[in-house]
């Protein structure tokens, strides 16, 4: 793929977002073993990711973003998700952590979309 594949991950011991992400990334790597995967995250989540070498080995670039300490997980996630364009250079495809990839995404590179494309909720 020409596009960078980008995830936003904020997780703590009290949720399953890291586990959901792992399933999503594992499914992505079945079809895109060598493509660039960037994960935008905060410091606490990055530590949890780094504690899992098998997971870390599937990530090309773990970008740790400084966020205010008083932000809860939801606000941290929303802040990163709405800032992706300012944090990633070049073209990218954002993948939600609860997405299971069931086939190649190569055709996304050829979509006739100039600046933005999206999938409707509950598709």
Listing of model-derived features with the role each one plays in the protein:
Residues 1-69:
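N-terminal anchoring/stem segment of glycosyltransferases
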């Amino acid at each position: 793929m020409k596009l960078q594949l980008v995830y936003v991950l904020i997780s703590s011991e009290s949720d399953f977002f890291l586990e959901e992400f792992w399933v999503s990334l594992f499914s992505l790597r079945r079809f895109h073993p060598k493509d660039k995967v960037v994960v935008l995250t905060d410091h606490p989540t990055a530590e949890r990711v780094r504690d899992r070498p098998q997971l870390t080995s599937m990530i090309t670039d773990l970008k740790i973003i400084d966020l205010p300490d008083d932000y809860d997980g939801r606000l941290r996630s929303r802040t990163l998700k709405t800032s992706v364009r300012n944090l990633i250079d070049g073209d990218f495809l954002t993948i939600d952590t609860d997405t299971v990839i069931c086939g190649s995404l190569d055709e996304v590179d050829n979509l006739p979309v100039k600046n933005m494309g999206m999938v409707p909720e509950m598709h």
